[in-house]
Amino acid sequence: AIAIIPLALLYVFGVWQLSGAPAPLVDDVRIRIVQASVPQRDKWDPAKQRAIFADQLDLSRHDPSGRKDDLAGITHLIWPEAAMPFLPLEHPDALVAIGELLPDGTQLISGALRLKRRGVSETAGPRRGYNSLLVFEDDGRLQSIYDKIHLVPFGEYLPFQTTLESIGLEQLTRWRGGFSTGETPRPLLSIVGLPPVAGLICYEAIFPGAVIQGDQRPGLLINLTNDGWFGNSTGPPQHFHQSRVRAVEEGLPLIRAANNGISAVVDGRGRIVAMLALNERGVIDSGVPSALEPPPYARLGDWTFVSLALLFTMLAFWAACGKCNYDRQTRVRGAERGSSRAQLSGSNAAAAPVTED
């Protein structure tokens, strides 16, 4: 029975949390998430890059019903990880197209690959590749950058690179030499109109306790991902629900843009405000829920569960000791009653008159 108590308490607490009133929305913010659902086999085909970018631009101009509205009333446009399958910062025509797409005051938040010289000099030395979240102003100028810091081994970098490359394994990474990691701890993005943003690219959203790495608490999580690698397996739903758990742990709203799904807006209690299913093509127009007060996990981290585990271990130990004491006392009382009955029987036998024939 003791073992069931934690599960029952978690269930009751979860029902109570989910039944609460909807979180208030951030003032004067209206986002559009674009899920173009580009097949993974086409994503990195050089011959299809222009068509994919043009399709991304066109889909962004339409509301969820398919009506063309040219982003009227939208303050922030969200594209998924590597939405532009090329290096947009190396293509001025792409930046011009972004500027032509965005109305005055609207910003684009998009995943993209980029090159940068790493070191003291920005003009000398080899350039390194980054998997990045880029924020563009309404004229196509770059405003902010977040570079992914938790890279996927063998997918984005090659562990023991020198050794493995010597035996011909560098082809395991798409980018020769692999991607480089961004600045740590994870910096927060300052985006006009939004609370401080923690950018999360792909599977950076699956690690509990690691989505916030600085002293300042963000007010919003933005997760850009491409789960097309997983196809129609259980991978995309699992990845989505893991990111929802991060929102619950931190009490923060989550905006998730995925190339093939699942894209969604989730509040700080893990409730889905809006969603596009796996392989569904379309857009989400939504407000952004406000952050909640930091829940226990956000304040204490894994000590929350360690403390609960110790508490219920102590309760189980106390219950086991109590049962042992009860059993021992029961045996003692039983022995005492048996002894009393034996003594009484002996006394009765001694007192009985002896009759002779």
Language model: regions and residue ranges:
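Enzyme catalytic cores with a strong preference for nitrogen-chemistry domains
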Residues: 1-357
